[in-house]
């Protein structure tokens, strides 16, 4: 039977000093011997998705202590990708994922904590905590801060739903008046919570549900809704049960690696494809799988992308539906229920509730359950009141959205498309693959061939797009923006947004070894691997080269001969794989990150082989 990790610091005469320090934190005589559970919070006033988390750690802590544990809270950093976007700050976003994972490991191992509750929400925080959880493999439950309410405003006598991306597009569109742009800006982000569409933050919080590491509603229940408080309360209670199951009953099914198995990762990826989630989730799932030694890679994602239909269409792929609408339609459980009925779910995988997915669907799927309590839970809706307070309202929709033919969530037979919402493309320009969010691509450009317009940085691309260098029919290539080449693999939301504002959203393609915001739509292909800085063929493209994209056949190719490609490679080897004439200040911290970063097909994790020998 495993021994409590915390006993290392709480038992024996030689630990008198450690016990003295524990006592100084409030631990009493009768507490020694109880499990020490880390409450890993990520409160910050910099990020709307985290601004309301300050008191929620102590809410969880109270429940842990009432259930017989010792709760100790600490915080991680949290970068707001939207605020860091479009300037040098974005270089720090992806590297912060590794920093978060490491800091959780440092705190938990330094103090010998027995288990964790991870309070996350936004883009790199959930993935960083997930990586740490799989690395440490101690009992864990995730509970996120929840999504923001969708913005709403009246334009042309019609109420429309808004989000951050709408504010960016309107702000860059010269045809939009200053007054309208300001109106959109003031309405786009009305409450605390992660941005209201199926962007990276909400995608990842949904995926923790599918992995089995969080409770029903975690990914979709609004941050402002009173019902969300129960998720935090229940997390505190449940983590003590899981902890005692493992340490006192030798039940290894309570450990994250035995919950988030390969089957669970396939469930999460199936959900991601079905809901047209952010392409960033591919990076993060691959990274988490590596941390947990789960055999899950791009080959699995490619296979699944050909099998799973697109069942749920949400902003930024449509303005009609946001996360509040996904919740009304049954949330993550609703989507997984449709995948199960289509034979596309591993329904014997287990969750932190101790149930198989088959059992959990029977209890929480609005299409199966008779429980009025569950149905009321999924009717939790927005209040439309600006606030930074969690649990501040208890509004409910009059009805659920159980229309599986034309509603927010659909059956396989009524899918938005039988082809899923994400696809892996391969070809001579991306031998190890690249990713496109097909949910956001107009059907008219699923096949696209055009001349390359090459930029060595995101900044140059923005200047080129706004300066008229890019024309209808072009393929914009932005390179040396990968994990190593950036460094930090910036998001290309501004280039894609400006293509839309210039009327080119359906007239151009964009290819990059960087990545995209979850708010991106259009023919935007990212994660080209190997990246340019690692000798990838994207570094060999020249202005005017034809690039052929064929999403239905999962291919992308540079239309030049193999001989020409080989000759260019010889020349580039001599020059070195570096961006030409790019002036960018890179700090020591970012250089250290770049020195070990792998390309996107490996999850942009650190290359452990560099530590061997």
From Swiss-Prot:
Record pathway: Amino-acid biosynthesis; L-isoleucine biosynthesis; L-isoleucine from 2-oxobutanoate: step 3/4; Amino-acid biosynthesis; L-valine biosynthesis; L-valine from pyruvate: step 3/4
Keywords: 2Fe-2S, Amino-acid biosynthesis, Branched-chain amino acid biosynthesis, Iron, Iron-sulfur, Lyase, Magnesium, Metal-binding
Protein encoded by which gene: ilvD
Catalytic activity: (2R)-2,3-dihydroxy-3-methylbutanoate = 3-methyl-2-oxobutanoate + H2O; (2R,3R)-2,3-dihydroxy-3-methylpentanoate = (S)-3-methyl-2-oxopentanoate + H2O
One term of GO molecular function: dihydroxy-acid dehydratase activity
Record note on cofactor: Binds 1 [2Fe-2S] cluster per subunit. This cluster acts as a Lewis acid cofactor.
Name this polypeptide is given: Dihydroxy-acid dehydratase
N6-carboxylysine: residues bearing it: 124
Co-factor requirement: [2Fe-2S] cluster; Mg(2+)
Family per record: Belongs to the IlvD/Edd family.
Transmembrane segment boundaries: none
Subunit organization: Homodimer.
Catalytic machinery residues: 517
């Amino acid at each position: 039977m495993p021994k409590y990790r915390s006993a290392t610091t709480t038992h024996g005469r030689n630990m008198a000093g450690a016990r003295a320090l524990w006592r100084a934190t409030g631990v009493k005589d009768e507490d020694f011997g109880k499990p020490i559970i880390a409450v890993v919070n990520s409160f910050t006033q910099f990020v709307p998705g985290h601004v309301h988390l300050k008191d929620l750690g102590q809410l969880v802590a109270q429940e842990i202590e009432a259930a017989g544990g010792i709760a100790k809270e600490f915080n991680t950093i949290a970068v707001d990708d939207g605020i860091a976007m479009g300037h040098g700050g974005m270089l720090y976003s992806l590297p912060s994922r590794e920093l978060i994972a490491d800091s959780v490991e440092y705190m938990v191992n330094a103090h010998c904590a027995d288990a964790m509750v991870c309070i996350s929400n936004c883009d790199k925080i959930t993935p960083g905590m997930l990586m740490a959880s799989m690395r440490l493999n101690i009992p864990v439950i995730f509970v996120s801060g929840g999504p923001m309410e969708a913005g709403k405003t009246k334009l042309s006598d019609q109420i429309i739903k808004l989000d951050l991306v709408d504010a960016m597009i309107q702000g860059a569109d010269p045809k939009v008046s200053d007054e309208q742009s300001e109106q959109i800006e003031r309405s786009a982000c009305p409450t605390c919570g992660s941005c209201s569409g199926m962007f990276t933050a909400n995608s990842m919080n949904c995926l923790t549900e599918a992995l089995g590491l969080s409770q029903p509603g975690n990914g979709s229940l609004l941050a402002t809704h009173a019902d969300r408080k129960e998720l935090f309360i229940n997390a505190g209670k449940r983590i003590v049960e899981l902890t005692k199951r493992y340490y006192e009953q030798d039940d290894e099914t309570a450990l994250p690696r035995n919950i988030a198995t390969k089957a669970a990762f396939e469930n999460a990826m199936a959900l991601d494809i079905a809901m047209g989630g952010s392409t960033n989730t591919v990076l993060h799932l691959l990274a988490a799988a590596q941390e947990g030694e789960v055999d899950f890679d791009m080959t699995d994602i490619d296979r699944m992308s050909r099998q799973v239909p697109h069942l749920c269409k949400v902003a930024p792929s449509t303005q009609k539906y946001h996360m509040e609408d996904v919740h009304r339609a049954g949330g993550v459980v609703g989507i997984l229920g449709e995948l199960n009925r289509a034979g596309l779910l591993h329904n014997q995988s287990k969750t932190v509730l101790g149930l198989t997915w088959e059992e959990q669907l029977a209890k929480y799927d609005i299409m199966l359950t008779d429980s009025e309590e569950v149905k009321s839970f999924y009717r939790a809706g927005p209040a439309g009141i600006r606030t930074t307070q969690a649990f501040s309202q208890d509004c409910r929709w009059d009805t659920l959205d159980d229309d599986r033919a034309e509603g927010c969530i659909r059956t396989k037979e009524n899918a938005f498309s039988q082809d899923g919402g994400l696809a892996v493309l391969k070809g001579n320009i991306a031998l190890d693959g690249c990713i496109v969010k097909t949910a956001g691509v107009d059907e008219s450009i699923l096949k696209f061939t055009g001349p390359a317009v090459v930029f060595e940085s995101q900044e140059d691309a923005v200047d080129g797009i706004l300066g008229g260098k890019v024309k209808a029919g072009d393929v914009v290539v932005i390179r040396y923006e990968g994990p190593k080449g950036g460094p930090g693999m910036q998001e290309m939301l501004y280039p894609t947004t400006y293509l839309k504002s210039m009327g080119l959203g359906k007239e151009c393609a964009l290819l990059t070894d960087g990545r995209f915001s979850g708010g991106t739509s259009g023919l935007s292909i990212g994660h080209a691997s190997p990246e340019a800085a690692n000798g990838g063929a994207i570094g060999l493209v020249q202005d005017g080269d034809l690039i052929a994209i064929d999403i239905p056949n999962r291919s992308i190719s540079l239309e030049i001969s193999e001989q020409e490609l080989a000759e260019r490679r010889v020349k580039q080897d001599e020059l070195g794989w570096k961006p030409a004439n790019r002036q960018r200040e890179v700090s020591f911290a970012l250089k250290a990150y770049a020195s070990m970063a792998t390309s996107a097909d490996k999850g942009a994790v650190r290359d452990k082989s560099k530590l061997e020998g």
